[in-house]
From Swiss-Prot:
Region called Disordered, residue ranges: 449-475
Source organism of this protein record: Arabidopsis thaliana
GO biological process, one term: flavonol biosynthetic process
Tissue: Expressed in leaves and flowers, and at a very low level in roots.
Gene3D superfamilies tied to this protein: Glycogen Phosphorylase B
Broadest EC class assigned to this enzyme: transferase
GO molecular function, one term: quercetin 4'-O-glucosyltransferase activity
Protein's name in the database: UDP-glycosyltransferase 73C6
Family the UniProt entry places it in: Belongs to the UDP-glycosyltransferase family.
GN (gene name): UGT73C6
Organism phylogeny: Eukaryota, Viridiplantae, Streptophyta, Embryophyta, Tracheophyta
PROSITE patterns noted in UniProt: UDPGT
């Protein structure tokens, strides 16, 4: 793959710090490749276990001539009271482990600081995940501009920005069931308090961690967003203004994965043979398959997963159902075989136990809809593939993303999930959508009503504008140029 040479007196050197969770790492590796294609020297700093997950994709990028360097730092699991190898969020099972994980992450400050000190050429810019607040201190110490990456879209980022400045709105609510309207917003949008990713109830041991993140956000030089202007124009404009002009939409970054093998291995090697998967899809009618995936950190209880399975079966439509974190669901595996579910659906249902080649599946012509947890990466991949979505948010920014997809973009059908899946309280929450609810929502999404046809038309249109945004002359391609010019001017004035 050719990359554009930087005809500047010295090359820019960006150091990237991905947070160790799949939804954060995947787009950051894509960003590394996008910047390297523009002639920027890239160093990615991560831990051994996480480096292994991206080895194949990065090796292919490096072999194609892209200037990417991967540096590994030892993960201090012992000091934080974790097991060896627990280096990624999807390997944690309790809230206590997550607290310990953040403790371990912040212990990386010293070894990383030593790395930066000895780096040559000197870094021109740090791009850090929002969860790695320690990088702010390093940026300050070495006087390097730090760009923040949140992994969210402009709609959600603006919502968080507005609510942090108007916190009394959340404080004055009488209960977690009461809805409020987000003020100063381009559209009338309502949420309950738990549905927005703003720090309201802070669990024990988290106050300092969250305060550090908010402070790191405030002191960063700017923000890059995995979105594109044409998707959420009013929100991109308002968010850029809120960040004094230093916000660049450069997505969908997943579109840097142009070859099949990169699409298939994006994030983690798949647990299904790529050819087997494509063969199954090839045997189905165009637009007939529903792809079902609730993300890498799905915490639905067994009772809810059974209802989802039965609803998919009763919909009588072909589907692919991805269940990640398979080890956690031993009872589900037993139910699949003992209840005869697997036998009954074998002709029209494909179960993927573990990782799936998501981008490859979504871009296949047989797929006509996407049942998603509305994580931002998945939402954007659905949009990029031009697919209407059935939305089933769990937590974090996912209720915000659902609102964008269903209410603003009008390319989604809601499964009508109103309650946030709190870690450790899943069983207590129980079933939120029964099999009838699942069947009804699938029919609404995949059926032939006028509304369904209009959703498909709009989704296809958005998919086309996503591809145009990253092409030369497109809004996201141009924004990368503006970002590089900004950092180059800064580097020259500092010299």
């Amino acid at each position: 793959m050719a990359f554009e040479k930087n005809n500047e007196p010295f090359p820019l050197h960006f150091v990237l710090f991905p947070f160790m969770a799949q939804g954060h790492m995947i787009p950051m590796v894509d960003i590394a490749r996008l910047l390297a294609q523009r002639g920027v020297l890239i160093t990615i700093v991560t831990t051994p276990h996480n480096a292994a997950r991206f080895k194949n994709v990065l090796n292919r990028a490096i072999e194609s001539g892209l200037p990417i360097n991967l540096v590994q730092v030892k993960f201090p699991y012992q000091e934080a009271g974790l097991q060896e190898g627990q280096e990624n969020m999807d390997l944690l099972t309790t809230m206590e482990q997550i607290t310990s994980f953040f403790k371990a992450v912040n212990l990386l400050k010293e070894p990383v600081q030593n790395l930066i000190e000895e780096m040559s050429p000197r870094p021109s810019c740090l791009i850090s995940d929002m969860c790695l607040s320690y990088t702010s201190e390093i940026a300050k110490k070495f006087k390097i501009p730090k760009i923040l990456f949140h992994g969210m879209g402009c709609f959600c980022l603006l919502c968080v920005n507005v609510l942090r400045k108007n916190r009394e709105i959340l404080d004055n609510l009488k209960s977690d069931k009461e809805y409020f309207i987000v003020p100063y917003f381009p559209d009338r949008v309502e949420f309950t308090r738990p549905q927005v990713p703003v720090e309201t109830y802070v669990p024990a041991g988290w106050k300092e961690i969250l305060e550090d993140m908010v402070e790191a956000d405030k002191t960063s030089y700017g923000v890059i967003v995995n979105s594109f202007q044409e998707l959420e124009p009013a929100y991109a404009k308002d968010f850029k203004e809120a960040r004094s002009g230093k916000a660049w939409t450069i997505g969908p970054v997943s579109l840097c994965n142009k070859v099949g093998v990169d699409k298939a291995e994006r994030g983690n090697k798949s647990d299904i043979d790529q050819d087997e998967c494509l063969e199954w899809l090839d045997s189905k009618e165009p637009g007939s398959v529903l792809y079902v995936c609730l993300g890498s950190i799905c915490n639905l209880p067994l009772s809810q997963l059974l209802e989802l399975g039965l609803g998919l079966e009763e919909s009588q439509r072909p589907f692919i159902w991805v269940i990640r974190g398979w080890e956690k669901y031993k009872e589900l595996v037993e139910w699949f075989s003992e209840s005869g579910f697997e036998d009954r659906i074998q002709d029209r249902g494909l179960l993927i136990k573990g990782w799936s080649p998501q981008m490859l599946i979504l871009s296949h012509p047989s797929v006509g809809g996407f049942l998603t947890h509305c994580g931002w990466n998945s939402t954007l991949e659905g949009i990029t593939a031009g697919l209407p979505m059935l939305t089933w948010p769990l937590f974090a920014d996912q209720f915000c993303n659902e609102k964008l997809v269903v209410q603003i973009l009008k390319v989604g059908v809601s499964a009508e999930v109103k309650e946030v899946m709190k870690w450790g309280e899943e069983e207590k929450i129980g079933v939120l959508v029964d099999k009838e609810g699942v069947k009804k929502a699938v029919e609404e999404l995949m059926g032939e009503s006028d509304d369904a046809k209009e959703r498909r038309r709009r989704a296809k249109e958005l998919g086309e504008s996503a591809h145009k945004a990253v092409e030369e002359g497109g809004s996201s391609h141009s924004n990368i140029t503006f970002l590089l010019q900004d950092i180059m001017q800064l580097a020259q004035s500092n010299n």
